[in-house]
């Protein structure tokens, strides 16, 4: 796999071990993919930004890259600040990339194309998930996310890898086949 997801505690407590393990396995990216609800404050986001820049620098020096994976909560305003914007505006673009989850950004009220335009080359990885009309997850191609339009911005995004995914499939093999077939039809 080109990337791995790790909890923030691994970065805080054993950054060198995380980097060494990822290099041994052959990952290109180490991705931090979750912030616990109690840590979703502006003060804590600012601490994470410092940590991400520091860890991103360690990764770069070791020949690997660091990225952050979004969910919907980064789009909820906190005292007039959208955490996703804070993360993108204040992390070093040469040290911190982002894995753009197209379902979660959409569910959070963000527009993937607008974010790609505003922050070019910051999203080298995408999670391809679809959203039903009721905002639940559905198989790719069966929902409301316009992947064909979004993929027109893959170069501006800096896209290197995308992952077809669904968090809650009733039959994972059926979901994988349907989603794969839907992406193939896009001829991207």
PLM regions: where:
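Short, structured active-site "lid" loops
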Residues: 1
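Active-site acidic/histidine proton-transfer and metal-coordination neighborhood
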Residues: 4-97
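Histidine-acidic metal/acid-base catalytic patches
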Residues: 26, 81-100, 104-188
